[in-house]
Curated annotation (Swiss-Prot):
Reactions catalysed: 7-aminomethyl-7-carbaguanosine(34) in tRNA + S-adenosyl-L-methionine = epoxyqueuosine(34) in tRNA + adenine + L-methionine + 2 H(+)
Gene Ontology BP terms: queuosine biosynthetic process; tRNA wobble guanine modification
Annotated organism of origin: Carboxydothermus hydrogenoformans (strain ATCC BAA-161 / DSM 6008 / Z-2901)
UniProt entry keywords in alphabetical sequence: Cytoplasm, Queuosine biosynthesis, S-adenosyl-L-methionine, Transferase
Descriptive protein name: S-adenosylmethionine:tRNA ribosyltransferase-isomerase
HAMAP family in alphabetical order: QueA (MF_00113)
Places the protein is found: Cytoplasm
Pathway it works in: tRNA modification; tRNA-queuosine biosynthesis
Cross-referenced PANTHER family: S-ADENOSYLMETHIONINE:TRNA RIBOSYLTRANSFERASE-ISOMERASE
Keyword Transferase applies: yes
Length: 338
């Protein structure tokens, strides 16, 4: 399977630069995966396509201010992106500029408050051992910036708009963007209608947004990301599967959690790291539906969606979305695949 099989034409002006004023007023393209039938709607009308008993599973991760700016001890500015926490003091990070970020280099972000030393090089970045005074999360909130994807050029006025309204557990370098469309009112309306909700956790890191560089996609190696599924969520998913009710993932991160822990059509409580790479031919055990945004050409996310709905159907839907000027990527419009 070739990387070019997942390419499509996207005019740059369709890449959404800012969130809409109201989260649930984004457009919704509904794709029926059996027939390829497409319906166009607005996200706040999601209820029309659900039935009482459907289980929506969301990712409760929260984006951290993962961009830090500092200087090397020897001089010269440096920027890092926190990607994965290794232990209490050590993080895997991306460093810019990378060519002078050698093992042993000391970095100063706020003198006496937050400093670090590069202690190792990894396949994708560096390991930094931080020294700090106080609580790391509080220091990060003071010094760090919310990381936005590189295709978003405009400054975000309200960082909360890059968080889902149910974000709880800090740890992500990027938002699980399918959830950005939900409002408290919409969730209440769906619950009143009989739709159930469950929460899992996946801290979004490089595994989600690392570009594919190999022409043969099977040679791509996913970066691992931390996940948790607790007992309550596992029980809700298993009950829905036993009773023949639909399990609908809100976002590709939820798909990867549920399918990582799937065993014979059931899930068990678990925590750990997943590097699950889902591409066409994958055997889905848990999910029956997917809410997701429109993804970058040649991305692992587009491959996952293609695995679930069929590559031709997905690329046809994308072509129609481009023609109808849907908004793409993180702050863009949504798809519901059922």
């Amino acid at each position: 399977m070739k990387l070019k099989d997942f390419d499509y034409y996207l005019p740059e002006e369709l890449i959404a630069q800012t969130p809409l004023e109201k989260r649930d007023e984004s457009r919704l393209l509904v794709l029926k995966r059996q027939t390829g039938e497409i319906t166009h709607d607005v996200f706040k009308n999601l209820k029309k396509y659900l039935v009482p008993g459907d289980l929506l599973v969301v990712n409760k991760t929260r984006v951290i201010p993962a961009r830090l700016f500092g200087v090397r001890e020897q001089g010269g500015e440096v920027e890092i992106l926190l990607v994965k926490r290794m232990n209490f003091r050590e993080w895997e990070v991306l460093v810019k500029p990378g060519r002078r970020a050698r093992v042993g280099t000391r970095l100063i972000f706020a003198p006496g408050v937050l400093e670090g030393e590069i202690v190792a090089q990894t396949e994708v970045g560096r390991i930094i051992k931080f020294s700090f005074q106080g609580v790391f999360e509080e220091i990060l909130n003071q010094l760090g910036q919310t990381p936005l994807p590189p295709y978003i050029k405009e400054k975000l006025k309200d960082p909360e708009r890059y968080q889902t309204i149910y974000a709880k557990e800090p740890g992500s370098a990027a938002a699980p963007t399918a959830g950005l469309h939900f409002t408290r009112e919409l969730i209440s309306e769906l619950k009143d209608y009989g739709v159930e909700f469950a929460e899992v956790l996946l801290h979004v890191g490089l595994g989600t947004f690392k570009p594919v560089k190999t022409e043969n996609i099977l040679e791509h190696k996913m970066h691992e990301e931390y996940y948790e599924i607790e007992n309550e969520a596992a029980e809700k998913v298993n009950k829905a599967k036993r009773e023949g009710r639909r399990v609908i993932a809100v976002g590709t991160t939820v798909v990867r959690v549920l399918e990582s822990v799937a065993d014979k059509g059931q899930v068990a409580p678990a925590k750990g790291y997943t590097d699950l790479f889902i591409y066409p031919g994958f055997n889905f055990q848990i999910i029956d539906g997917l809410i997701t945004n429109f993804h970058l050409p040649k991305s692992t996310l587009l491959m996952l969606v293609s695995a679930f709905a069929g590559r031709e159907k997905v690329l046809n839907a994308y072509e129609i979305a481009v023609r109808l000027r849907y908004r793409f990527f993180s702050f863009g419009d949504a798809m519901l695949i059922i």
